[in-house]
Design a protein with these regions (language model features):
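Nucleotide-activated chemistry modules centered on ATP-dependent adenylation/adenylyltransferase
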Residues: 1-239
Length: 239
């Protein structure tokens, strides 16, 4: 039985690779990694590759392909897969993008939080939860950092979310920590990083930093900073 408070206290003293080692020892085949192939995704993907080399076991990497990612993200995913060779499990919504738009319209254009939450539930949260169930996941690691949003700043290294354990190996990392790790290990940057993006999601809800907004404040037209994957309750917690 995992004690959240005691485990989080133990994890606070560990660096990111050691947190992944702890999770593998604790959850075994129930451990998975989620990735968005965003600006900082290469860091945890590299750490999972290193874990595989130490343990001999491939941790499955779950990628929710919404069907609305920028072309650069799809190409970046191919580049990292070829470079690092992880066990990628790409999942999609049961409802196609065309069907969703026919039934609900272009949900991101209405300017309402309700439509944006419906979009995120259909395209992201439900496919991810289905993948967790299919793979028998009991704990998933993600690249959330405390400095990204107010909600994430209040997170602990390990918390229960929608009946599973959510591990945040990079919770205390800064943008500089991410950049220097990638430089140290020769990891390629996302193509949109050089165009001023500090975070990348779907093409219609991402924008480069413009001097007045930056980070996840550029996402979802400023209506919200979380897609729902990393949130407890009906909308879930996340990628």
């Amino acid at each position: 039985v995992v004690d959240a408070a005691a485990s989080s206290a133990q994890l606070e003293a560990l660096d990111a690779p050691a947190r992944l080692d702890w999770a593998y020892r604790t959850f075994g085949a129930g451990l998975a990694l989620t990735t968005s192939f965003g600006i900082q995704s290469a860091v945890l993907l590299h750490m999972v590759r290193e874990l595989a080399q130490r343990s001999g076991v491939q941790v499955p990497v779950i990628w929710v392909d919404t069907g609305y990612l920028p072309p650069e993200t799809y190409r970046y995913a191919e580049q990292l897969q070829e470079l690092l060779g992880f066990d990628l499990r790409a999942v999609q919504a049961t409802m196609s993008a065309a069907r969703m738009e026919a039934l609900h319209g272009r949900l991101w254009e209405s300017g309402t939080l309700e439509d944006l939450e419906l979009y995120n539930r259909l395209r992201k949260v439900e496919p991810l939860d289905r993948a967790f169930q299919d793979l028998g996941v009991s704990c998933w690691a993600s690249g959330v950092r405390g400095s990204q949003t107010d909600h994430r700043r209040a997170m602990a290294p390990l918390q229960a979310v929608r009946g599973l354990w959510s591990l945040r190996p990079l919770l205390s990392w800064s943008r500089k920590d991410v950049f220097y790790y990638m430089e140290q290990h020769g990891l390629p940057q996302h193509p949109l990083f050089e165009q001023g993006y500090s975070t990348v999601g779907d093409w219609h809800t991402s924008a480069p930093d413009d001097g007045t907004t930056s980070g996840r404040a550029t996402r979802f037209a400023g209506l919200k900073q979380e897609c729902g994957i990393h949130l407890p309750g009906l909308m879930g917690e996340g990628i």
